[in-house]
Amino acid sequence: MRYADPSANRDLLGNRTLLFIFICAFALVTLLQQILYSKSYIKRYFEFYKEPLEFNSTRCLELRQEILEVKVLSMVKQSELFERWKSLQICKWAMDASEASLFKSTLSRCCNAPNFLFTTQKNTPVETNLRYEVESSGLYHIDQEIFKMFPKEMPYYRSQFKKCAVVGNGGILKNSGCGKEINSADFVFRCNLPPISGIYTTDVGEKTDVVTVNPSIIIDRFHKLEKWRRPFFSVLQRYENASVLLPAFYNVRNTLVSFRVKYMLDDFQSRQPVYFFHPQYLSSVSRYWLSLGVRARRISTGLILVTAALELCEEVHLFGFWAFPMNPSGFFITHHYYDNVKPKPGFHAMPSEIFTFLRMHSRGILRVHTGTCNCC
């Protein structure tokens, strides 16, 4: 007859007790962490209901530093970045004249938008062999006919405009009510023929001074303007007398279709000017942002326009620039304010670009709008 060993039962009971104590301790620590986090979150949440704080106040300097201490996007979780950005919204943004001036001086040395944003008769004389931005495309010879398409000189000069709005097409603009604030800017840049009339005007405004056109739009939607041209002309008319800007010298594929836009508007006796990005400017801008950590096969049109605006305008405001599937509050949004068509993967580095803008906002160089607007 076998007898159970009482000490074995005691050991088993002791092990279970230790396990129970460990589980309870772990649960208690987790609960305390949640309570402490909740207090911090609640504190930050209620800060949004106070009067806006001055951008250079002690609290705002702390919040700005929380953004600036993140050197690269991979350092923090997306949710943590959003939380830091939301907290900063209690601060009334103000331009830091010293930071902005320093940044603009570096752009002047590297890129020089007032002289090289567009091809002009001054910077691209007749008989020039103009190198494409994509160097493998070779050179384009500027003959007398093409030379006549160029303006005599750049139509804009350094810090010509007091306040500029660069309007991206992000879904963050939907239900923002930012239309009036965008319209109140002295100069407005837009990207790639976005819809601005009807249901969109309240959120995105309608004032447009420069609108870019990606030649792929003309190729895919308007059959290279080889046949019917009026549908494309009608689209451009929505922007009234806005200048039309194209990357004719990015590569060979873009050149002829970009020239056709100029020919078409001349045929219709339109007052809309047509300009072409200078490939030297595009190359310089790409190298500049690469040196600051924006690595992409090609930087976005939005980033190019922001770069130009920083030289041409005293104060730059960004609307519709957001590259995440959720807004800062964690709600899912569409990719564009007018559709949910995603870009080709791996072509642009949009999250990196937006992260760079958030850091520039925190430094007082430009302002990024990601919430609702209460203007005018």
UniProtKB/Swiss-Prot annotation:
Catalytic reaction list: a ganglioside GT1b (d18:1(4E)) + CMP-N-acetyl-beta-neuraminate = a ganglioside GQ1b (d18:1(4E)) + CMP + H(+); a ganglioside GQ1c (d18:1(4E)) + CMP-N-acetyl-beta-neuraminate = a ganglioside GP1c (d18:1(4E)) + CMP + H(+); a ganglioside GD3 (d18:1(4E)) + CMP-N-acetyl-beta-neuraminate = a ganglioside GT3 (d18:1(4E)) + CMP + H(+); a ganglioside GD1a (d18:1(4E)) + CMP-N-acetyl-beta-neuraminate = a ganglioside GT1a (d18:1(4E)) + CMP + H(+)
One Pfam entry name: Glyco_transf_29
Glycosylation-annotated residues: N56, N241
Location, primary (coarse class): Golgi
Class in the EC hierarchy, top level: transferase
Binding of substrate, residues: N192, N214, P215, S216, S300, T301, G302
One GO BP annotation of this record: N-glycan processing
GO molecular function: alpha-N-acetylneuraminate alpha-2,8-sialyltransferase activity; sialyltransferase activity
Disulfide bond positions: C164-C313, C178-C373
Location within or outside the cell: Golgi apparatus membrane
Transmembrane segments: 17-37
Record pathway: Protein modification; protein glycosylation
Membrane topology according to the record: Single-pass type II membrane protein
EC number(s) on file: 2.4.99.-
Tissues and organs where the protein is expressed, per its UniProt entry: Expressed in liver.
UniProtKB keywords: Disulfide bond, Glycoprotein, Glycosyltransferase, Golgi apparatus, Lipid metabolism, Membrane, Signal-anchor, Transferase, Transmembrane, Transmembrane helix
Keyword Disulfide bond in annotation: yes
InterPro entries: Glyco_trans_29 (IPR001675), Glycosyltr_29_Sialyltrsf (IPR050943), GT29-like_sf (IPR038578), Sialyl_trans (IPR012163)
Enzyme active site: H348 (proton donor/acceptor)
Any one GO CC term of the record: Golgi membrane
Function according to Swiss-Prot or TrEMBL: Involved in the synthesis of gangliosides GD1c, GT1a, GQ1b, GP1c and GT3 from GD1a, GT1b, GM1b and GD3 respectively.
Family to which this protein belongs: Belongs to the glycosyltransferase 29 family.
Protein name in UniProt: Alpha-2,8-sialyltransferase 8E
Source organism (scientific name): Rattus norvegicus (Rat)
Gene: St8sia5
